[in-house]
Design a protein with these regions (language model features):
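Catalytic loop of short-chain dehydrogenase/reductase
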Residues: 80-99, 103-107, 118-165
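Conserved Rossmann-fold cofactor-binding substructure of NAD(P)-dependent oxidoreductases
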Residues: 53-69
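Conserved glycine-rich Rossmann-like NAD(P)H-binding loop of the short-chain dehydrogenase/reductase
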Residues: 21-39
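Rossmann-fold cofactor-recognition segment
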Residues: 42-57
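C-terminal helical subdomain
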Residues: 174-177, 186-226
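N-terminal Rossmann NAD(P)H-binding glycine-rich loop of SDR-like oxidoreductase domains
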Residues: 10, 14-20
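Rossmann-fold scaffold of SDR-type NAD(P)-dependent oxidoreductases
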Residues: 7, 71-79, 130, 173
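Conserved mid-core alpha-helix of short-chain dehydrogenase/reductase
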Residues: 58-61, 105-112
Length: 226
């Protein structure tokens, strides 16, 4: 039985990761920021941890909540979205919300969680996956749609790639879920939540040291550029 940690699991992709890993017989620890989200996690049989990734004080206490754990697979799924383009200056509130959740939360989690992932499999190490977006790919930008969101996810990719050398036993990747039918992706998206998460789970199982620090699609294939 593997130990799986899902950070940002109250709904959508995060909740589906919890559902699928629990169905596979894995032990799952998962975070949510409110009571309703925590109850959804408990209903799936997960160990629910209260955490608000947009609040640095909340994230700073993650390590003691995970004390003694060895994590085979950790996933940072938490994220917020904005559609605003470059024709409108981002507000301070919008910028701070996206950067705190999408970037700072992940950067705070890495030093607390990565050492626990390194201890997995009798010290051989596990996998730490950060859910990013294809909209972060600088080499294929065709629009400023989601301007601040794009910037935040590109920053997340760099946070992952630059943290990787400090944790040689851990395979750290930034993985896009694809265009998914969630509150963020909309009803017209190509993939259901179930399809996206199933594909990502297969890709995660197939990760090897050659993938360290990589920017991957939901099927595990690398993007053509950063």
């Amino acid at each position: 039985m593997r130990a799986v940690l899902v950070i940002g699991a109250s709904r959508g992709i995060g909740l589906e990761f919890v559902r699928q890993y629990r169905a596979a017989g894995d032990r799952v620890l998962a975070t949510a920021r409110d009571d309703a989200g925590l109850q959804r996690l408990r209903d799936l049989g997960a160990t629910a941890i209260k955490l608000d990734v947009s609040d640095p004080a909340s994230v700073s206490g993650l390590a003691w909540q995970l004390d003694g754990e060895q994590i085979d697979i950790a996933l940072y799924v938490a994220g917020v979205y904005s559609q605003t383009g470059a024709d409108t200056p981002p507000t301070q509130q919008e910028f701070d919300k996206l950067m705190h959740t999408n970037v700072l939360g992940a950067m705070q989690a890495i030093p607390q969680v990565a050492p626990l992932v390194a201890q997995a499999r009798q010290g051989k190490g596990g996998k730490f996956v950060f859910i990013t977006s294809g909209m972060a790919q600088i080499g294929s930008v065709e629009s400023s749609f989601g301007w601040t969101y794009r910037v935040s996810k590109a920053a997340l990719n760099m946070a992952v790639a630059s943290a990787q050398p400090d944790y040689p036993k851990v395979i750290m990747v930034a993985m896009s879920p694809g265009w998914v039918r969630t509150d963020m992706g909309g009803a017209g998206a190509a993939l259901s939540v179930e399809e996206s998460v199933s594909a990502m789970r297969r890709a995660i199982d197939g990760l090897t040291p050659k993938h360290k620090g990589a920017f991957l699609q939901h099927d595990g294939e690398p993007f053509s550029s950063w």
